[in-house]
Curated annotation (Swiss-Prot):
The keyword Transmembrane helix does not apply. Its EC number is 2.1.1.-. It is an enzyme of class 2 (transferase). It comes from the Eukaryota. GO terms for biological process: methylation. Probable methyltransferase. It comes from Schizosaccharomyces pombe (strain 972 / ATCC 24843). This is Uncharacterized methyltransferase C1348.04.
């Protein structure tokens, strides 16, 4: 499913856990204003190197997702392709609180995570019910899984 073709993405996009940065770069090439964050300094260095020769609307930052105070209400769209399900259980609440902080009432969050029913990929990841509960506790209302 292509969120761009479906018209689901809006101007200011956050790519959470942006390695290998192809989503951030692709969306920036289409004119979206994109911020790509990853906790890995190496991932961000690679992303910056890849985009250094491109004119683009993408800004990469090495950050802990739970520390995005300067972006209050900034993002129209957040995409998370595999970040949330790979963080520690103890980081779920700070992560979802940050989502609530950086989004506004009309923002959309697109979260892709491993499924417990896909046994070939399942490696003690937390289930979707746990994700949904953490998101609801922090008032993240628009969510596509």
């Amino acid at each position: 499913m292509n969120l761009v073709q479906l018209g689901k993405l809006h101007e200011n996009v956050l790519d959470a856990g942006c390695e290998p940065n192809r989503n951030a770069r692709y969306l920036a090439s289409l004119g979206y204003k994109v911020v790509g964050i990853d906790i890995s300094e190496r991932a961000i260095s690679k992303a910056i190197d890849k985009t250094s020769s491109e004119k683009s609307n993408v800004n990469f930052n090495q950050r802990d997702f739970s520390r995005l105070n300067e972006f209050k209400g900034h993002f129209d769209t957040v995409i998370d392709i595999g970040c949330f399900h790979s963080i520690l259980n103890s980081d779920h609440e700070p992560y979802t609180a940050s989502l609530s902080h950086i989004c506004h009432s009309d923002s959309s969050v697109f979260l892709r995570a491993f499924s417990e029913t896909n046994k070939s990929r399942y490696r003690r990841w937390q289930g979707h019910k746990r994700y949904s509960l953490a998101l609801k506790r922090n008032n993240v209302k628009k969510l596509s899984l």
